[in-house]
Amino acid sequence: YLKGCWTKSYPPKPCFSR
């Protein structure tokens, strides 16, 4: 499930949460 949040890495990647 893709949450509407982003990692603080570069390039920014979508973070996944179950």
From Swiss-Prot:
Residues with Arginine amide modification: R18
Family membership noted in the UniProt record: Belongs to the frog skin active peptide (FSAP) family. Brevinin subfamily.
GO cellular component: extracellular region
Keyword Kinase on entry: no
Cellular localisation: Secreted
InterPro entries, per the entry: Frog_antimicrobial_Ranidae
One BP term from GO: inflammatory response
Name of the featured protein: Peptide tyrosine arginine
Tissues expressing this chain: Expressed by the skin glands.
Disulfide-bond pairs as recorded: C5-C15
Pfam families cross-referenced by the UniProt entry: Antimicrobial23
Keywords: Amidation, Cleavage on pair of basic residues, Disulfide bond, Inflammatory response, Mast cell degranulation, Secreted
Superkingdom classification of source: Eukaryota
Function: Mast cell degranulating peptide. Inhibits granulopoiesis in human bone marrow in vitro. Causes histamine release from rat peritoneal mast cells in vitro. Does not induce apoptosis of human neutrophils in vitro.
Residues annotated as signal peptide: none
